[in-house]
Amino acid sequence: MKKQVKWLTSVSMSVGIALGAALPVWASPDTSVNNKLNFSTDTVYQIVTDRFVDGNSANNPTGAAFSSDHSNLKLYFGGDWQGITNKINDGYLTGMGITALWISQPVENITAVINYSGVNNTAYHGYWPRDFKKTNAAFGSFTDFSNLIAAAHSHNIKVVMDFAPNHTNPASSTDPSFAENGALYNNGTLLGKYSNDTAGLFHHNGGTDFSTTESGIYKNLYDLADINQNNNTIDSYLKESIQLWLNLGVDGIRFDAVKHMPQGWQKSYVSSIYSSANPVFTFGEWFLGPDEMTQDNINFANQSGMHLLDFAFAQEIREVFRDKSETMTDLNSVISSTGSSYNYINNMVTFIDNHDMDRFQQAGASTRPTEQALAVTLTSRGVPAIYYGTEQYMTGNGDPNNRGMMTGFDTNKTAYKVIKALAPLRKSNPALAYGSTTQRWVNSDVYVYERKFGSNVALVAVNRSSTTAYPISGALTALPNGTYTDVLGGLLNGNSITVNGGTVSNFTLAAGGTAVWQYTTTESSPIIGNVGPTMGKPGNTITIDGRGFGTTKNKVTFGTTAVTGANIVSWEDTEIKVKVPNVAAGNTAVTVTNAAGTTSAAFNNFNVLTADQVTVRFKVNNATTALGQNVYLTGNVAELGNWTAANAIGPMYNQVEASYPTWYFDVSVPANTALQFKFIKVNGSTVTWEGGNNHTFTSPSSGVATVTVDWQN
């Protein structure tokens, strides 16, 4: 059921009066290709590498693994990194305003061809890995990958790599000869296989039925060999592997299947990335169906240190524009409720289709819904991601039909032009990157919303009806007095508007009409737009983006602790790099005070970590519970809730890796730290504390560990 929490907050954005032409990319630090920790100003283009362009036929697989005529969509088609590089260099992507590419997982996958139900299948998609320290030869060599990174950066494009540490490749619990038996290699040396797994590299709990979060984490996803992250060999191997790719210049990581890995391990994992020499933006895939929102999903987005693909937004956009099963009022409700639920809404990655969904464009249908959905996504909060071929109106329902070969590169398609007009606006107007959202006019077919950041504003109007024009009257706005031209130049039947005294003069929004009007100005007072990453230990360098910081260094305050001098690494009007001070761990507010002594509003919920993080599995035996009770964990550090029931860790699990009345949970805790902890039983507002003395355990200096105790009455 959709949450209906209302939120009407002022939004800040920066843009000049629109003239209907594409706006130049601002050369400010926050919008730079070098800003690897904030993607709010970017427009991402998702590519299934094998399905984009074959730039080097010499690396194509041979024999049964390759479909030269593209007739079997489960086989390789030949797309590679050279092909992507070619499309960067020929201007197709830059011409569309794309500033980040999200490519298929680049690591070595199995080469076996697997027959499922009479159809040959391959690892063309990149999700059947076997060696995270080598490249997929069908995509190219390390040299090819480095060339792709270099070409992208030279064209002001970031590169995000897909990464799937949840699993290796298909395996059978009864047939070791099936495929490659889940084999995992370390730069060519076999670490182990799913069968005869004496090292405990994998979970052996059968396949998940998706009935519980626990089942999804500790059981196999379909027939994929599920990696056991609570294993020191695995933990160190995966950390080494991601550093290899970061050292090659990757700018961001999209984690596959985050719903199916322990949140505690993932928090410790991304914290190691943020503490490395090459910290980058991270986001993960937690699939949600239409009208679905779960507390586990919200908790992950708010507490893991990683951001998420915004499935709630995507599903609603599809229902409103593609399927017409919901209204613009419903869309406004989702914008409001997600803005209230997610602490870091501007970091959620928005989209309208991807490799796991039916293509947005339907065969034989009007293209206007696709164009309007793109316009809304590009002007809404979050980081917009466009699936390859959507701008060419590619169609296809379900896997693999939604992963066809790129059909063409026509720059005259209306959808391409919509992206071309609006993507640069995210760079030039901070209202789109950082601003909040206010509904200005809404009915079942029309949505008028405003983004605002300081005095920067963008106003967007969309009419999804293909037959009815609507008179718009009484719409309020923060736009200054004046006449504003549609940024889209009438491409989607938009019009100009006049603003007087905070009200838009009455106008008619055409059937199928979409318009964007905007205003930009400089800010004299500091306004924080984003902080990246959103968690870090003392000593880590974080990036603060926004406007009005000035060019003279002053101070950044964490809670009540001011940071000045050399601990401010750099200070520019739109971006500050600062070291996290030695303050109490936990969520804290961050403010910026400029040289004039003006202090910004706070960026809340920056999560200060106690120290470097490791993963510990906490297990408690004989914790019997009454109906409605669950077991939670709390202890003496912020990562364990600081002895408060409200911040306790859990609810713990008791079905897969251990069985009731034993409960367990994998938790990210500070390394090499003397921990004290207890378990509590919770039923609503009723909390029952464990008796006896505090349990004690010293966490390891690195890796993972397990501590097992008995419940104390």
From Swiss-Prot:
Residues recorded as binding Ca(2+) 1, renumbered to this chain, are 54, 56, 59-60, 78, 80
Q: Could you confirm whether the keyword 4Fe-4S appears in this record? A: no
What segment(s) does the record annotate as region C? 435-522
Q: Note the SS bond partners.
A: none
Going by the entry's taxonomy, the superkingdom of the source organism is recorded as Bacteria
Q: What GO cellular-component annotations does this UniProt entry give?
A: extracellular region
The signal peptide stretch is 1-27
Residue ranges of the region described as E: 610-713
The catalytic activity, as recorded, is: Cyclizes part of a (1->4)-alpha-D-glucan chain by formation of a (1->4)-alpha-D-glucosidic bond
Q: Which residues form the active site?
A: 256 (nucleophile), 285 (proton donor)
Q: Where does substrate bind?
A: 127-128, 167, 220-223, 254, 259-260, 355, 399, 403
Where does the chain bind Ca(2+) 2?
166, 217, 226, 260
Record's SMART domains?
Aamy, Aamy_C, CBM_2
Region A2, annotated ranges: 230-434
Query: What Gene3D superfamilies does the entry give?
Result: Glycosidases, Golgi alpha-mannosidase II, Immunoglobulins
- Please give the family membership noted in the entry: Belongs to the glycosyl hydrolase 13 family.
- Written domain comment of the UniProt record: May consist of two protein domains: the one in the N-terminal side cleaves the alpha-1,4-glucosidic bond in starch, and the other in the C-terminal side catalyzes other activities, including the reconstitution of an alpha-1,4-glucosidic linkage for cyclizing the maltooligosaccharide produced.
Its recorded name reads Cyclomaltodextrin glucanotransferase
UniProt organism field: Paenibacillus macerans (Bacillus macerans)
